[in-house]
């Protein structure tokens, strides 16, 4: 199975492609799609849409996994990120791909084993898990990480509801839309 992972962003969207053969993961490609901050928002969204569509056509994945939007302190940033994510999802669905969604917590637990891992830890573990010769950019590492999350059975944890029984056993609960322990 070939999986395309996406880390959405308005300035920089990361992508990562990997193959899953049984329990083995193999790196195929990764990179970033950048939009020009000098252009209008609709033009930037079109750049992301076109870039994602091209990546999907080039690497012909069987499915896509994308990171869910987190709620930022700045509502304007959250709205812009949501629009970039929407453009990415449209590009994926436009290529006929099923799209699976994962939170940053799910990604970090799948890759590092710790939900509060920092970007450097995610980069390092992605490099090790996929036997890469160099460290990928943080955007590409997150995209590869979300693909790894999906490859390792993340599709059964696609929603917070899928995680709820395990989290409850660990003393965690949802409060005001956030996970607390």
Swiss-Prot record:
By its UniProt entry, which Pfam families does this protein fall under?
RuvC
Q: Does the keyword DNA-binding apply?
A: yes
At the top level, the lineage of the source is Bacteria
Q: Which residues bind Mg(2+) 1?
A: 7, 139
Sorted keywords for this record are: Cytoplasm, DNA damage, DNA recombination, DNA repair, DNA-binding, Endonuclease, Hydrolase, Magnesium, Metal-binding, Nuclease
Catalytic activity reported: Endonucleolytic cleavage at a junction such as a reciprocal single-stranded crossover between two homologous DNA duplexes (Holliday junction)
Q: Which residues form the active site?
A: 7, 67, 139
**What is written in the cofactor note of this entry?**
Binds 2 Mg(2+) ion per subunit.
Q: Which GO terms describe its biological process?
A: DNA recombination; DNA repair
InterPro entries with a match to the protein in the record:
RNaseH-like_sf, RNaseH_sf, X-over_junc_endoDNase_Mg_BS, X-over_junc_endoDNase_RuvC
Example of a GO MF term: magnesium ion binding
Compartment(s) where it occurs, according to its Swiss-Prot or TrEMBL record: Cytoplasm
Which cofactors must be present for this protein to function? Mg(2+)
- EC number(s) on file: 3.1.21.10
GO cellular component terms, semicolon-separated: cytoplasm; Holliday junction resolvase complex
- Positions contributing to Mg(2+) 2 binding: 67
The job of this chain, per UniProt, is described as: The RuvA-RuvB-RuvC complex processes Holliday junction (HJ) DNA during genetic recombination and DNA repair. Endonuclease that resolves HJ intermediates. Cleaves cruciform DNA by making single-stranded nicks across the HJ at symmetrical positions within the homologous arms, yielding a 5'-phosphate and a 3'-hydroxyl group; requires a central core of homology in the junction. The consensus cleavage sequence is 5'-(A/T)TT(C/G)-3'. Cleavage occurs on the 3'-side of the TT dinucleotide at the point of strand exchange.
* Matching PANTHER family: CROSSOVER JUNCTION ENDODEOXYRIBONUCLEASE RUVC
Task: Tell me its family.
Answer: Belongs to the RuvC family.
- Give the multimer and partner information: Homodimer which binds Holliday junction (HJ) DNA. The HJ becomes 2-fold symmetrical on binding to RuvC with unstacked arms; it has a different conformation from HJ DNA in complex with RuvA. In the full resolvosome a probable DNA-RuvA(4)-RuvB(12)-RuvC(2) complex forms which resolves the HJ.
Q: What is this protein called?
A: Crossover junction endodeoxyribonuclease RuvC
**Source organism of the structure:** Cupriavidus metallidurans (strain ATCC 43123 / DSM 2839 / NBRC 102507 / CH34) (Ralstonia metallidurans)
